[in-house]
């Protein structure tokens, strides 16, 4: 049934003891197409989202197909399947195993900026707060599953988070600052900033910049001070070099009051002429009625990964 069982989780399951025979619900083969490639092949209904059948779970998971297509997080599919088609062990536990809190947090950190871009929020039903920590309960995470290839990166056994990674090959597709791009992408913020440093922690890269001038802002307050620009992957795209001054155009995470530097953002070496152009472009954008917050997207934006019929533009 298992194609790899974490030793720690197995030991913890054994400590729980076997469920009484009368209460042990039957495990069933995973029939959800998106979850079949995952390292378990048996599940149990109802799942963690209270779907009584896998057919219901399939319909509910369809809304995430577009988000999965963006490759916003390597943990998203694992997390969704652990919620919608949870691992079931016949002998050791009468309740399906939940994903670890750290898995949820990594998936959310990578994909929530994409949802925000299309005026969606991370679903409350997938909140990370109530999920178990790696060292305080039985839970499952990708790095805990033993495979023939071994772990992709060393893990901290105390919390399930990585201690370090190998060099990640980043392929950034440059986006040139033009009026057409500016009007199409409708950035939340535009700043002139000097890069102080680029910090890397596990899969997260953060650029620390000193804001020199604010050309555009939206709902997140931007001080003329040192601020962090957050990414949603282990790559800094567009790339930034320390001690260089840039004009940076990006998006924001209103809920966490964060400025984001994600796919579709622009960073070019600062030139006074370019700064003046951007101010003119923004005036035109406001004249077109796009410079402020637009109505929310239709639900199809989440499913397809593209905006609906509202005026929100795509990158």
Swiss-Prot record:
GO MF annotation, one: Wnt-protein binding
Keywords of this entry: Developmental protein, Differentiation, Disulfide bond, Glycoprotein, Secreted, Signal, Wnt signaling pathway
Gene3D superfamilies, per the entry: 2.40.50.120, Frizzled cysteine-rich domain
Gene Ontology CC: cytoplasm; extracellular space
Disulphide connectivity of cysteines: 27-88, 35-81, 72-111, 100-139, 104-128
Residues bearing attached sugar chains per UniProt: 41
Origin superkingdom: Eukaryota
Biological process according to GO: canonical Wnt signaling pathway; cochlea morphogenesis; convergent extension involved in organogenesis; epithelial cell development; hepatocyte differentiation; negative regulation of canonical Wnt signaling pathway; negative regulation of cartilage development; negative regulation of cell development
Residue intervals of the NTR domain: 170-290
Signal peptide (residue range): 1-21
Disordered, as annotated region: 284-315
Pfam families to which the protein is assigned, alphabetical: Fz, NTR
FZ domain location: 22-142
Localization per record: Secreted
Notes on the domains: The FZ domain is involved in binding with Wnt ligands.
Function recorded in the entry: Soluble frizzled-related proteins (sFRPS) function as modulators of Wnt signaling through direct interaction with Wnts. They have a role in regulating cell growth and differentiation in specific cell types. SFRP3/FRZB appears to be involved in limb skeletogenesis. Antagonist of Wnt8 signaling. Regulates chondrocyte maturation and long bone development.
Name of this chain's protein: Secreted frizzled-related protein 3
Organism from which the protein derives: Gallus gallus (Chicken)
């Amino acid at each position: 049934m298992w194609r790899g069982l974490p030793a720690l989780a197995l030991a913890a399951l054994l400590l729980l003891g076997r469920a009484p025979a009368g209460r042990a619900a039957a495990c069933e083969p995973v029939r959800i197409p998106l979850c079949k490639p995952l390292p378990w092949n048996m599940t149990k209904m109802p799942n963690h989202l209270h779907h009584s059948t896998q057919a219901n779970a399939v319909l509910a998971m369809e809304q995430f197909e577009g988000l999965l297509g963006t490759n916003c997080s390597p943990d998203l599919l694992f997390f969704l399947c652990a919620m919608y088609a949870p691992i079931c062990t016949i002998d050791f536990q009468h309740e399906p195993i939940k994903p670890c809190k750290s898995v949820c947090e990594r998936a959310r950190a990578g994909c929530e900026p994409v949802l925000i871009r299309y005026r969606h929020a991370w679903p409350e039903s997938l909140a990370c707060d109530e999920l178990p920590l790696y060292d305080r309960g039985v839970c499952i995470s990708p790095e805990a599953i033993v495979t023939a290839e071994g772990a992709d990166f060393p893990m901290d056994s105390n919390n399930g988070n990585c201690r370090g990674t190998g060099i990640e090959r980043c392929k950034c597709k440059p986006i040139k600052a033009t009026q057409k791009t500016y009007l199409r992408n409708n950035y939340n913020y535009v700043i002139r900033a000097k890069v102080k440093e680029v910090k890397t922690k596990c899969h997260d890269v953060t650029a620390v910049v000193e804001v020199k001038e604010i050309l555009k802002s939206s709902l997140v307050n931007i001080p003329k001070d040192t601020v962090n620009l957050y990414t949603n992957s282990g790559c800094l795209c567009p790339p930034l070099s320390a001690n260089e001054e840039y004009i940076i155009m990006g998006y924001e995470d209103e809920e966490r009051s964060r400025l984001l530097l994600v796919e579709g953002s622009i960073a070019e070496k600062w030139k006074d002429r370019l700064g003046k152009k951007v101010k003119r472009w923004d005036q035109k954008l406001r004249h077109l009625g796009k410079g402020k917050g637009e109505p929310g997207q239709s639900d199809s934006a989440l499913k397809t990964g593209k905006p609906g019929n509202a005026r929100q533009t795509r990158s």
